[in-house]
UniProtKB/Swiss-Prot annotation:
Keywords: Methylation, Ribonucleoprotein, Ribosomal protein, RNA-binding, rRNA-binding. It comes from Staphylococcus carnosus (strain TM300). Belongs to the universal ribosomal protein uL11 family. This is Large ribosomal subunit protein uL11. One of its GO terms (molecular function) is structural constituent of ribosome. SMART domains: RL11. Part of the ribosomal stalk of the 50S ribosomal subunit. Interacts with L10 and the large rRNA to form the base of the stalk. L10 forms an elongated spine to which L12 dimers bind in a sequential fashion forming a multimeric L10(L12)X complex. It comes from the Bacteria.
Length: 140
């Protein structure tokens, strides 16, 4: 029989940099998970994506064991990296902070495809373009 999921914890952690300090420690401590076990496994699984923030969904079972699924980095993080900016615009409709090409948007859409609710690559690109627009990044 399958183990019963007791709790699902969702976190966004920098790749390869999970440690027992907040926010990881308290979130997993409340669920009764072996924090160091999670940190070592997460860091090993994400070390090649260093510098990106990785969303992770941790399923905690009744017997205190856990499994976790890493997702693709959030679109704004990938857009900022592609555009070479630290943060988006405070007034995206007035101040444009950077420009990305259609090819960069296509690349981000292909990366994000497993996590996006899009039927095809064109729809995924439109989602990414909308995110860019709301950050003050123009798409050419």
């Amino acid at each position: 029989m399958a183990k019963k999921v007791e709790k699902v914890v969702k976190l966004q952690i920098p790749a390869g940099k999970a440690n027992p300090a907040p926010p990881v420690g308290p979130a997993l401590g409340q669920a009764g998970v072996n924090i160091m076990g999670f940190c070592k496994e997460f860091n090993a699984r994400t070390q090649e994506q260093a510098g990106l923030i990785i969303p992770v969904e941790i399923s905690v079972y009744e017997d205190r064991s856990f499994t976790f699924i890493t997702k693709t980095p959030p679109a704004p993080v990938l857009l900022k990296k592609a555009a070479g900016v630290e943060k988006g615009s405070g007034e995206p409709n007035k101040n444009k902070v950077a420009t990305v090409t259609k090819d960069q948007v296509r690349e981000i859409a292909q990366t994000k495809m497993p996590d996006l609710n899009a039927a095809d690559e064109e729809a995924a690109m439109r989602i990414i373009e909308g995110t860019a627009r709301s950050m003050g990044i123009t798409v050419e």
